[in-house]
Amino acid sequence: MINMATITIDDDVYKELLKLKGRKSVSEFIKELLEERKRKNLDVFMIAFGSRSEEDVEKLKKELKEAEKWMQSLIQV
């Protein structure tokens, strides 16, 4: 079962969103934007912490996944 939520955005923002999303659903488009942002954040993270040990990197990845789960739980409320 997929949880759904309703969001409210200004009309001008919605019109721009429709132009940008093309044939994708709004959900697909937003999901892609979020994935792109995650990738960019990971790139910055790797630049900043690339000299860490493999153990430190794995620990940080685990903490980031936990933070992401927590953030997702907030979105689903």
Swiss-Prot record:
Alphabetic keyword roster: Toxin-antitoxin system
Q: Quote the InterPro entries the UniProt record gives.
A: Put_antitoxin
Q: Which Pfam families match?
A: VAPB_antitox
- What family is it from? Belongs to the UPF0330 family.
Function statement: Possibly the antitoxin component of a type II toxin-antitoxin (TA) system. Its cognate toxin is VapC3 (Potential).
Q: What is this protein called?
A: Putative antitoxin VapB3
Provide the species name.
Answer: Methanocaldococcus jannaschii (strain ATCC 43067 / DSM 2661 / JAL-1 / JCM 10045 / NBRC 100440) (Methanococcus jannaschii)
